[in-house]
Amino acid sequence: LMEDGVLIAPAPYSNPAAYYFPTFKRMSSLEVLKGAPLLRYGPQTTGGVINLISTPIPDEQKGYVEAVTNERGSTDVHATYGDTNGDWGYLFETVQRSAQGFKDIDRSNRNSGFDISDYVGKLRWQGDRQSVTAKLQYSEETSNSTYVGLTDADFNQDPNRRYGLSSPDQMDNTHSGVSLTHQFEWSDNVSSTTTLYRNDFKRNWYKLSGAGNIIDQANAGDANAQGILDGTVDTSGLNYKNNAREYVSQGVQTNFDVNIGNHEFDFGARAHEDEMDRFQPVDVYDQVNGSLVFQNSVAPTGSNNRFETGEALSFWALDKWQATDKLSINLALRYEDVQTSRTQYADPGRTTIDSTRANDSAELLPGASFTYDLTQSWQVLGGVHRGFSPLGGGARANEEPETSKNWEAGVRYFGNAFFAEVIGFYSDFSNKAENCSVGSPCSNGATSGSFITGEAEIAGAEFQLQTGTRAGDFYLPVSLTYTFTQAEISKDNAASGLKKGEQLKDVPENQMSFRTGMEHPSGWDNYLVATYVDEMCVSAGCNNTATKLDETESLFLVDFISRYALTASADVFLKVDNLFDEQQ
């Protein structure tokens, strides 16, 4: 995941499971790269690359305001203003989001919503053959979110209920980013782009630990456990952990674009380092007469008090070769040299080391792909590249990173008002790995580090169709995407305990999205979007277990949006998410 070509995850090498996603409202477009060309980027080079393009500095004085509210009292405001005057251009941007949430917390006056503030400033100097762009970003978020769920009986009675035990749960985070980009045209055929960047992310999710055990007991018929959840039974020793972590991600990257004849070359390098500082004290509460009473705090040691680092040096070389008028060939080569480490401390003052880990890996990642125009309407494509994903700071010295060989082949049709594409894909993993987090535990139950599942195969096909027709004054666009995927262990693994044929986690077999609409020259446009996601394993091997809790249920959602242009510069819209009120 990148923003404007810069790694935006909190710590992509030392802590790849860490989650952060920029405010999407301030993005102007989205780039998705797959196949051999994605080796221009990294570290993950298996499934694809997402590059978020932020709002550009306008060429002239321009402003924009969008204000949205909904039935629950949530508000979203997005505003930008910028200008270019002579050699100088600038942009100011902000997003302000506030929501009350939709869950009701027992015995609490706290809502289950969030507040988000995001600010961006850009300044650019443009010379005859070069430019310098500075970008500053700062955001903060407070979310009254929890991982605590409900018993089956309570969910069936009221899925929007939250137990009072989860009332203190709250996520607080801040993110700041700075980058300086220099672009230079050395000649008509050679240019370079160099970026210095740094991102800081601080978060503390204060939340109840161990609630899942109480819910499991209540599901098994334990009336005392149900009473604890309802607040009618007193209990002691409830642990509320400060899941506090600080991340730093920084580096410098440069890329040269060189055009020679029918070849477009990319040569580049990146020096990157990131870190995670985890310091997680625990507050102990008792529940007395339905209220939480503070008892004491426990200083962090071991896994709650650790420091992880990642250092990486990357090189890449790509050649986009227009071999003939009909044949285009992409050749790519990437090199990743990664060093990670973890240090756990036995005392809060970090004077005594409890344990250490370190891992070094160096991978050469080649790739090649092509497209060939059979006719003006028909095109075939194919490619193969080597995939790579680092394990993170929790990797031991003898553990190998995830690597794979990835093939794709397909055909495209371009018509006057019709586009269709079918692409088959196959990935052969010599060492499939899962990155563990509390939000997405690994198949062995771990909530940090990595879990090696062993050899695996992922195969499937993607289908895409776009067309449209006219009905009087209306234009009716239609688009359909469908993906079929099979993902399973390909060889028994004694270390992980997984067997050949067991399904991988988090990979639905069927996914589909259908979009249609009615567009009118008056500016009144209406769209309907239907999305389907199949059930999928929450831990590897769910196809060989008997419990329904080992996999999700399938989900089908329909959204509707209607937009009307009041003037050339102002419009209004109505959007209904989840039109049929599906909830699972």
Task: Label every model-predicted segment.
Residues 6-34:
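Short acidic/polar hinge/loop motifs at secondary-structure boundaries
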Residues 62, 69-98, 107-146, 170-187, ...:
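Transmembrane beta-barrel wall of Gram-negative outer-membrane proteins
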Residues 67-71, 85, 96-100, 127-129, ...:
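Transmembrane beta-strands of outer-membrane beta-barrel pores
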Residues 126, 131-137, 172-345, 371-373:
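Face-selective signature of the C-terminal outer-membrane beta-barrel domain
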Residues 181-185, 189-209, 373, 379-383, ...:
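Membrane-embedded beta-barrel scaffold of Gram-negative outer-membrane proteins
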Residues 247, 262-264, 270-274, 303-428, ...:
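Structural signature of Gram-negative outer-membrane beta-barrels, strongest in the C-terminal barrel
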Residues 324-325, 329, 426, 449-541:
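Gram-negative outer-membrane beta-barrel transporters
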Residues 430-431, 475, 532-541, 560-584:
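C-terminal beta-signal and adjacent terminal beta-strands/loops
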